[in-house]
Amino acid sequence: MNLFTGDLHNVVAQIFASAENTYCQIVKEMAVDTVFYKVQDQYHGGNGTYFNFNAENRFSLISKSKGVMYLATTPHTGLKEYYQEYEFIDTEDDLELNCMAEIQAARTIKIIDLAALAPLLKTALGDLMGPKTVYADTQLLAEVLSNYADGMEYLSRHTGKPCIALWSDAADGNGMLKNLSVTPLTEYSHNGMSAKQILKSHLNYKVT
């Protein structure tokens, strides 16, 4: 499947070389202290920051020259992204082991707004968020865009809320992010709601 016409490197270069107001429309700055959320498989020594160089997912780089890390802007979306293929969630097997990492921007992070960029690429935003058959295209896009920004913002296919894909040439992000906390989901709460309540009441999961 080919979502792009022409040489993508040249197309993106022309977009970024165009009028400054175009750049302002597609590039956002995430301020220092912005908080992100990520569910991870275990505690990992209290570390939530890890850029995966071996990932083979939507916005990983084909060259593996940089690792990718996915973050959500709400814990609800972080939970849904992690458990997207689950029908039932087990408290003992899942919630006691899996953890919510809260991570903070340690510096200003420049991200590309995929919703603003897609029309300039003459590509439907929905196609970029399609099934795994589009990964060759989205990974190529990530490869090109990683030369212009720290990451990109896209909308979760599951909640419609913003998610962030970040790239770094260091597994620890080289000072881009700061760990705030890593908490087992059995102990995690946000705005007075436990992770279990969010999963059941807001995300409609069956939690046993």
Language model region names:
Residues 59-89:
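Extended catalytic/binding region for NAD+/ADP-ribose chemistry, centered on the ART fold
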Residues 2-62, 85-208:
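Active-site and NAD+-binding cores of ADP-ribose-processing enzymes
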